[in-house]
Amino acid sequence: MISVTTLKDRKVALFGLGGSGFATARALVTGGAEVTAWDDNPDSVAKAAAEGIRTEDLRNIDWSQQALFVLSPGVPLTHPKPHWTVDLARAAGVDIVGDVELFVRERRAHAPDCPFIAITGTNGKSTTTALIAHILKSAGYDTQLGGNIGTAVLTLDPPKAERYYVVECSSYQIDLAPTLNPSAGILLNLTPDHLDRHGTMQHYADIKERLVAGSDVAIVGVDDSHSALIADRVERAGVKVVRISRRNVVADGIYAEGTKLIQAAGGAMLPFADLDGIQTLRGSHNAQNAAAAVAACLAVGVSADAIRAGLASFPGLKHRMQPVGQRGRVVFVNDSKATNADAAAPALSSYDRIYWIAGGLPKAGGITTLAPYFPRIAKAYLIGEAAAEFAATLGEAVPYEISGTLERAVAHAAADAERDESAASAVMLSPACASFDQYKNFEVRGEAFVGHVAALDGITMLIGPATGEK
């Protein structure tokens, strides 16, 4: 745990006692701050109180005595309207921050030179974050992985020289981290997202820009207009910018030509790595993720050979285009995290012959946007509440069956793929749906898929065992 010592003996108000909020409260208390915490959920308040954290409705505290207000990233700061605690803090002139800002302050106070890589973007954050951490760990570096990827940043080991931090940052976390200053900051891309919380696309882009604007080295994907403008603007402000692209040549940076990553510097274009054959980095979207990881690792001093070795051994992100088993020429892919059509598109674009397991609790829009990938689908196996709707969309374009359950879909898809005498194929769970009609969450759905695959005869598992339980 990182004890927040920079607020020792000072009064701090905190709202939000979920996962990261609870961890933040503990880190503040351990560091000696006088914390008063609250949450709208009585169970969360009771849990904090049982751990010795002082709890009180923040409507009743003296805000003029608070040195700082810590807000959990899931609580609205600006849109659709500020949370009531935000209004109280602003009325009293109290600064509002989040857990990433507290981490930044502790690093600055105790180990300002320890390498810190921060990653943001609309898509690809988690894969890029996990890939960077894997490369660093494989190269023997003391590596701490956290942030929006699922591990609260203040639960990591304390900052010290030669300890490397890899932190995924959501727009909400950046908005609450005014002095964010990573050694290498990555902005992968920008498309409209979370506008219910940020109001406009411009405001959303402005928040994302803060991460790279404060970086020693800014690594920016320039395949969308918003990010390209940010790269130019940050560069004019004096920040060193490394551009990355999966579509176009860049003058100084890393770009992709098919599966090859090219390093451009000083007018030279040098091959850096080839992703061909790396199952966990298939697709042009992963070429961009890999380019960002390469640029970041080079920026913090990792050797080219160590980076190449890390790329080749990357196990992938769980439930995201994750190869889990192999039988002959058939690979079994767990893409359970694809809970809408846009999220399913990268996996469908990455394989040429697919036995597609799809369905669950449908999202607005269905799968109509996936029509360009229908020629890649040998057959679809439809499950859950969305089965009938998806069947209507597929029509005569794609052969399909309504399997109903995931277990039946896996068995039928595996049998059909094995009989397929054409090129290598993939049995893929990429549901384009939420899981809640049949499973607690997409993780449980993914583990169930892995379990059903493991139960097939003649399977070579590419990952550890799974329970397959719902």
From Swiss-Prot:
Q: Name one GO molecular function term.
A: UDP-N-acetylmuramoylalanine-D-glutamate ligase activity
What are the GO BP annotations of this UniProt entry? cell division; cell wall organization; peptidoglycan biosynthetic process; regulation of cell shape
Q: Which UniProt keywords apply?
A: ATP-binding, Cell cycle, Cell division, Cell shape, Cell wall biogenesis/degradation, Cytoplasm, Ligase, Nucleotide-binding, Peptidoglycan synthesis
Claim: Cell wall biogenesis/degradation is one of the keywords in the record:
yes
Gene Ontology CC terms, in alphabetical order: cytoplasm
Q: Where exactly are the transmembrane stretches of this chain?
A: none
Q: Which reaction does it catalyse?
A: UDP-N-acetyl-alpha-D-muramoyl-L-alanine + D-glutamate + ATP = UDP-N-acetyl-alpha-D-muramoyl-L-alanyl-D-glutamate + ADP + phosphate + H(+)
**Pathway membership, UniProt:** Cell wall biogenesis; peptidoglycan biosynthesis
Which EC number(s) are documented for this chain? 6.3.2.9
Q: Where in the cell is it found?
A: Cytoplasm
Q: Where does ATP bind?
A: 121-127
What is the annotated role of this protein in its UniProt record? Answer: Cell wall formation. Catalyzes the addition of glutamate to the nucleotide precursor UDP-N-acetylmuramoyl-L-alanine (UMA).
HAMAP family xref list: MurD
Family stated for the protein in its record: Belongs to the MurCDEF family.
Name under which the protein is recorded: UDP-N-acetylmuramoylalanine--D-glutamate ligase
Q: Which organism is it from?
A: Rhizobium johnstonii (strain DSM 114642 / LMG 32736 / 3841) (Rhizobium leguminosarum bv. viciae)
